């Protein structure tokens, strides 16, 4: 591909190469550079890609794209932003695949995964569409699942995945759009037919300087959409929407909005409500419990309508949707009269939502097993300690991906937030032992909520991911204690 075509729409500061030259490939990892290819040097947080320009040259790089002035003798194109350049190079290299499909982008702290999976189900059921999905749990092309390591892939891989979706015949691509993805230009060059804002609560403050920065970063999505669905009940609603350039549909579970819920019923096996849109009133039933499911359902109904699906058809499709893995997921406990649920709740708001929802229908005691991740925003740890012990009858505070931090230090931060008058908690740092203990003390009608891991099947300790599937832990302990 000609260099000038790869660099279309990119702000160039300086170059010493012929724009008519042919480029064989693109890489931003110097180890993947091939003869005649392009190396994009990314100035990262931990590593500066410019340090690897000599290695790229040894491997045969024909041109280096960088935001810095390289050493003499290096064929280069200097650009204003290396991350933005990588994203747009990806768009150009793969033939702008996003323009061949309707793109849907969902942002927010909680609810992104459930909303994207439910919308995929609605589009498939109502339109018979082949739908691509990029998310926290997995990437999908139709029914084919592709493992994922981050919510939104790096920009070049993202464009490659969109190209796969296009080539496989997908008419729609639904994406979870994280604040990291927006800030790091991973979704640059994409324009969304529909966007969505679920909610905003404290998270990722290890990356963003404050909540205002976190909000403003996510709000950029609404300058890249034709239409969007926004949660009117969220406290960040006004700031989120103030600079939006797209048509907005508000949703609410508390009062009137463009689309809102009334007659809400929270049941042990799901939720029911009436969706109101203008003069229309449509019953909605979804077999996923929790008040947050009402918001996810409204979000999905709104996006479906913006994509041309009637409220009635979207609601009918939602009624056939199954639960989402790791989201209020019931774990089989044969022979036991207590219930075990797994949920991805790993933020203060997420933990409060799931525990409050379960508490609403729990006939026995609510036992919460939870922790906080290492190398992440420490501010939320005491907040989650207070929430967990305030709502649950019994809390078991434990580890959840300590990464490079000392697990006992993390746990001490969580315990620091517990009210002085509370004695309803235990600290068991080993997560497997914590789960075993919760099962040992569970009685008839009790519900155990294993919060934090959700769909994850690992525990990350000292930078190494060790296999840990809570479904297996529960099943194996039941088998062991049965014998």
Please report, for each region that a protein language model flagged, where it lies by residue:
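A short, gly/pro- and small-residue-rich
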Residues: 49-62, 76-85, 193-199, 216-218, ...
């Amino acid at each position: 591909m000609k260099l000038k075509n790869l660099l279309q729409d990119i702000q160039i500061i300086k170059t010493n190469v012929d724009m008519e030259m042919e480029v064989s490939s693109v890489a931003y990892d110097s180890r993947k550079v091939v003869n005649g290819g392009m190396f994009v040097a990314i100035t990262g947080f931990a590593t500066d890609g410019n340090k690897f320009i000599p290695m790229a040259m040894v491997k045969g790089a024909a041109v280096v794209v960088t935001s810095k002035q390289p050493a003499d003798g290096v064929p280069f194109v200097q650009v204003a932003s290396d991350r933005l350049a990588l994203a747009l190079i990806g768009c150009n290299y793969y033939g702008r695949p996003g323009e061949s499909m309707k793109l849907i982008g969902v942002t927010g702290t909680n609810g992104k995964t459930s909303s994207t999976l439910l919308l995929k189900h609605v589009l498939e059921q109502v339109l018979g569409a082949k739908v691509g999905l990029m998310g926290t749990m997995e990437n999908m092309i139709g029914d084919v699942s592709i493992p994922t390591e981050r919510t939104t892939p790096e920009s070049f891989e993202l464009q490659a995945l969109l190209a796969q979706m296009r080539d496989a015949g997908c008419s729609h691509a639904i994406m979870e759009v994280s604040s990291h993805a927006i800030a790091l230009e991973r979704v640059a060059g994409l324009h969304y037919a529909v966007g969505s804002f679920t909610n905003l609560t404290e998270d990722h403050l290890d990356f963003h300087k404050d909540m205002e920065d976190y909000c403003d970063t996510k709000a950029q999505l609404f300058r890249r959409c034709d239409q969007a669905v926004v949660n009117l009940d969220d406290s960040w609603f006004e700031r989120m929407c103030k600079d939006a350039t797209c048509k907005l549909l508000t949703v609410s579970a508390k009062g009137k909005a463009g689309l809102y819920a009334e007659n809400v019923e929270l049941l042990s096996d799901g939720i029911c409500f009436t969706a109101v849109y203008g003069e229309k009133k449509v019953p909605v039933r979804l077999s996923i419990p929790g008040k947050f499911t009402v918001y996810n359902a409204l979000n999905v109904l709104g996006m479906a309508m913006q994509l041309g699906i009637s409220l009635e058809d979207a609601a009918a499709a939602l009624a056939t949707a199954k639960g989402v893995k790791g989201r209020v997921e019931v774990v089989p406990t044969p022979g036991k009269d207590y219930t075990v649920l797994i949920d991805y709740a790993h933020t203060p708001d997420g933990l409060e939502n799931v525990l409050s929802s379960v508490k609403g229908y729990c006939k026995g005691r609510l036992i919460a097993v939870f922790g906080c991740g290492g190398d992440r925003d420490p501010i939320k740890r005491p907040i989650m300690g207070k929430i967990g012990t305030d709502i649950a009858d019994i809390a078991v505070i434990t580890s959840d991906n300590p990464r490079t931090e000392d697990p006992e230090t993390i746990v001490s931060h969580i315990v620091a937030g517990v009210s002085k008058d509370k004695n309803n908690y235990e600290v068991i740092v080993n997560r497997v032992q914590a789960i075993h203990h919760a099962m040992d003390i569970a009685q008839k009608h009790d519900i155990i909520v294993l919060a934090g891991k959700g769909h994850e099947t690992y525990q990350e300790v000292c930078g190494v991911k060790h296999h840990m599937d809570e479904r297996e832990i529960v099943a194996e302990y039941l088998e062991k204690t049965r014998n």
